[in-house]
Amino acid sequence: MSSALMPVRTHIVIPARLKSTRLPNKPLLTIHGKPMILWVAEKAQLADFADDMCIATDDESVAKVCAEAGFDVVMTRSDHASGTDRLAEVAAIKGWAAHDIVVNMQGDEPLIPPLLLEQVKTLLVQDAESVMATLCEPIEDYNTFIHPSVVKVVSQNTNNQQRAIYFSRAPIPCDRDVVLSDEDNTQAPKNAYRHLGLYAYRVSLLQQFVHWSQTPLEILESLEQLRVLENGGHIAIAKAACPLPAGVDTQEDLDRLNAMSLTAFQDD
């Protein structure tokens, strides 16, 4: 059967690494008594558009916890340059077809709405010329706009498809008149958008990605998606259909989630 006639399958992959610099052992830290990675995996199970899901880790302790909870686990190498390189290894191990789609679900976002997972997958399906898809949300606060930990994205409409032009930790786009004025800035430009680290990939891209060397801008900005743009790939992008609750990067974030009602983690 030709690939054009074969069904496109969608796979959710949740990368889980213990070596977080700001919050060690993050996947196994508990929220209301349950390891965070299990909260995330249970969210993935609610995404009924997906054919399957798995957890990708390089740590035996994470693998043990997830396997004992009944989840599919893929052991990966520990020396990947980026999360996308890790996904490529998973796709190769699983033998997924080149035309399949992989949704990368962050392992530190236990409150992510499954709606956003489906949105990013649908976005890629609808843009046949793009090899990746991702989401963004408007930035209003100026301090958020200029903070280097907040990744900004600028995009353009091409053939009725919105596609990313560039991602940066710098405040882009720059309003020249505001920058040159002596007034204190309190608001970001009207067309400032924050990139949300949620991706859908074609497996064919993952197969190419691992053969590309890290690119100058990718290394400079420490943003793996720039490797795709620098190699001529298109990345579809859209404004998130609903807010994405903050994930867990610090102990304060973890404390905040533990202080929330248990019902906040349960979907109707």
UniProtKB/Swiss-Prot annotation:
EC number(s) reported in the record: 2.7.7.38
EC supergroup of this enzyme: transferase
Catalytic activity line of the entry: 3-deoxy-alpha-D-manno-oct-2-ulosonate + CTP = CMP-3-deoxy-beta-D-manno-octulosonate + diphosphate
Pathway: Nucleotide-sugar biosynthesis; CMP-3-deoxy-D-manno-octulosonate biosynthesis; CMP-3-deoxy-D-manno-octulosonate from 3-deoxy-D-manno-octulosonate and CTP: step 1/1; Bacterial outer membrane biogenesis; lipopolysaccharide biosynthesis
GO molecular function, one term: 3-deoxy-manno-octulosonate cytidylyltransferase activity
Coiled-coil region(s): none
Gene3D superfamilies the UniProt entry points to: Spore Coat Polysaccharide Biosynthesis Protein SpsA, Chain A
Keywords: Cytoplasm, Lipopolysaccharide biosynthesis, Nucleotidyltransferase, Transferase
Cell compartments where the protein resides: Cytoplasm
DNA damage in keyword set: no
HAMAP family assigned to the protein according to its UniProt record, in alphabetical order: KdsB
Protein name (record): 3-deoxy-manno-octulosonate cytidylyltransferase
Protein species of origin: Psychrobacter arcticus (strain DSM 17307 / VKM B-2377 / 273-4)
Gene: kdsB
